[in-house]
């Protein structure tokens, strides 16, 4: 029996889960979601969680391992892991956390690395399959996810199990594919010294595309979205501008042409980058489209054009025909990954 404490720690919320592993099955013993802004540091969250566990379970079982996926860079210095959650001011130290939890080792991993491990624990109902393909055992697995930014990672077989390797693929150059995307690139170059694909294929990118189309003065802007975008432009990054644009684009009654064209450009740019990652990895173990945006715009990604653009790679398009491609629907994939990794320590 293995008892694991796992966490998915983001800028606004933290989800902690205590789970028991028997053979390959996990049983959730207790879990709780915390609003990060309500706590001065992570230790306060941890103490409250442990106290709640004791109330719920009668006592806290002896932990076998703990792993926390954190929305920030992880630093490894002489086997000591540290991390910083910038917008909350929280700091993490693996040695200190191990002392607090009375265990030998605590693992800190980047939140997108946690997503990488998480795809190994997903069930069929957690996925929407774009292309069934043919799985080749122990082949590379690719993971890409648009949220606030754009995460990319891959899984490689180490002879015993899969290991996740983080990349900074979201910061590679944006490559426009047509005249309108060239205009978009020129527009963004007025703001930035260089334009990464993350500037387009992300939640921030959705707003940037909207601003580009709005400033061309070719499509009328709706007052509701205009208000949210103006708040975003004034520094309120939690104005939900991107979500409002996506929702309007999918509305059967709204018919917001500006939102619809924004999401068309976003979806096509995202598809092109998914295809780029597929070419670089040849992930015959599967390619997983994760991140917070995909499940929310699933109808747009179910359109056959999304898959067509993924595979539209000219002379080498045929290389992608047999790669299994899935959209991750389970929002707890990062927590699942932290749980799986924690159990392997």
Which functions belong to the PLM regions below?
Residues 4-8, 63-67, 107, 141-145, ...:
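Short glycine-aspartate micro-motif
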Residues 1, 60-65, 103, 138, ...:
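A general structural motif
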Residues 14, 73-75, 149-153, 208, ...:
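Short, acidic Gly/Pro/Ser/Thr-rich loop/turn segments
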Residues 129-132, 136-199, 203, 298-299, ...:
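Glycine-rich phosphate-binding loop of actin/hexokinase-like ATP-binding domains
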Residues 1-56, 183-345:
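ATP-binding/phosphotransfer module of carbohydrate and carboxylate kinases, centering on a glycine-rich
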Residues 120-132, 343-345:
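Short, electropositive alpha-helical surface patch
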Residues 55-108, 113-126, 143, 296-299:
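Short beta-strand-loop/turn "lid" adjacent to the catalytic site in phosphate-handling enzymes
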Residues 34-35, 84-89, 107-114, 133-136, ...:
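Active-site nucleophile and cofactor-binding loops and adjacent substrate-binding regions
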């Amino acid at each position: 029996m293995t008892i694991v404490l796992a966490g998915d720690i983001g800028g606004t919320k933290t989800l902690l889960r205590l789970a028991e592993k028997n053979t390959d099955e996990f049983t959730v013993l207790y879990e709780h979601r915390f609003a990060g802004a309500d706590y001065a540091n992570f230790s306060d969250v941890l103490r409250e969680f442990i106290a709640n566990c004791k109330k719920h379970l009668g006592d806290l079982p002896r932990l076998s391992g703990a792993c926390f996926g954190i929305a920030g860079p992880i630093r490894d210095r002489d086997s000591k892991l540290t991390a910083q959650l910038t917008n909350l001011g929280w700091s993490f130290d693996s040695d200190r956390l191990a002392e607090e939890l009375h265990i030998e080792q605590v693992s800190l991993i980047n939140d997108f690395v946690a997503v990488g491990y998480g795809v190994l624990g997903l069930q069929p109902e957690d996925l929407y399959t774009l292309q069934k393909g043919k799985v080749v055992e122990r082949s590379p697995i690719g993971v890409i996810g648009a949220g606030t930014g754009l995460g990319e990672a891959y899984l490689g077989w180490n002879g015993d199990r899969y290991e996740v390797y983080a990349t900074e693929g979201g910061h590679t150059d944006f490559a426009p594919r047509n005249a309108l995307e060239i205009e978009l690139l020129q527009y963004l170059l007025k703001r930035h010294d260089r334009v990464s694909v993350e500037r387009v294929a992300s939640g921030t990118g959705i707003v940037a595309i909207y601003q580009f189309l709005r400033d061309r003065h070719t499509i009328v802007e709706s007052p509701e979205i205009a208000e949210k975008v103006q708040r975003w432009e004034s520094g309120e990054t939690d104005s939900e501008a991107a979500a409002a644009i996506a929702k309007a684009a999918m509305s059967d009654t709204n018919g917001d042409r500006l939102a619809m064209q924004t999401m068309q450009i976003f979806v096509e740019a995202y598809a092109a980058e998914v295809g780029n990652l597929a070419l670089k990895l040849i992930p015959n173990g599967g390619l997983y489209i994760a991140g917070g945006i995909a499940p929310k715009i699933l109808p747009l990604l179910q359109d056959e054009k999304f898959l067509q653009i993924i595979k539209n790679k000219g002379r080498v398009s045929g290389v992608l025909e047999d790669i299994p491609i899935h959209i991750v629907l389970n929002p707890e994939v990062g927590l699942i990954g932290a749980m799986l990794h924690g159990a392997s320590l």
